[in-house]
Amino acid sequence: RNRPSKKLFDLVYKKLKKKKLKRLLNNSSRFFSLNVGKEIHQLIKKKEKLILFKSKKDVNKHFGWDNNKPIVLILAHVFTEGNLSHSWNLFHNNFDWLEETIKKIKKIKSVNWIIKPHPSEHIYKSKVMTLDIYNKLVNDELNIKLFPSSHDIQDFDKFISAVITSSGTAGHEYPMKSIPTIICGESNYSGFGFTLEPKSKKEYFYMLKKINKIKKLDKETIKRCFAYNYLNKYVALEKIPLLYDTNITMQFE
């Protein structure tokens, strides 16, 4: 679904000249903010006034965290969506992925972990929510917190060292900001060289254990991500004027 061919990707990647890349990097904050959370979901809550974290110090103060530890963002999924649409995944479904991930990070104290529920959980009305899994598994682990619903995810990329997603859109968004992103299953953007893709659970859990050692992405890797986003935004997707523009709630007026 909307996955560009490797041949087309390689063509765009090679054509992306250094001057163009420099301009993209200089405008990466704007390009990033235009894309993160703009798929369909956050648009629903657009009218709500949300709080922005001002700094990493502000984040750590909010959660009572140590300023010296890196922050890793884990982006949860809707557990009833996208479980059978990939050719490979390290886990049976997104529910298992989150549960097993939390069980592992409970033992990793060198990192502050923040889990963000999917913004459209309440629309799908799943019987199990991210909060349920969090409450079941997280006890007195002070370095594992839920992202507060009162706050906006925009600009949070400035305060984190890495991102983890099963196979969500974050995998082609955060690498634009040189943030290493681990994915656990096939996606439209997997295999193009800008995400970390463990081949087994053992390798994935090892990455989690060593995640505080992961370095920022280099310019060539970021370039690969921009090449994909160019294809995704301007080539692969085409608006059809006859279709009504709406959001996932499907509430027509």
Describe the predicted segments one by one:
Residues L8-K69, K202-E253:
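C-terminal amphipathic helix plus adjacent low-complexity
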Residues F79-L84, S120-K125, I153-F156, G171-E173, ...:
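Flexible loop/turn segments at secondary-structure boundaries
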Residues L34-N135:
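Conserved catalytic-core segment of nucleotide-activated headgroup transferases in glycan assembly
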Residues S149-L196:
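A donor-sugar binding/catalytic signature common to diverse glycosyltransferases
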Residues R1:
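Conserved nucleotide-sugar donor-interacting segment of glycosyltransferase catalytic cores
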Residues I71-L73, V111-I114, K145, S161-I164, ...:
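Beta-sheet entry/capping signal
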Residues I144-P148, T195-M207:
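Short acidic-hydrophobic, aromatic-tinged amphipathic segments that line or gate anion-handling sites
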Residues L131-P148:
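Nucleotide-activated donor-binding/catalytic signature segment of Leloir-type glycosyltransferases, i.e.
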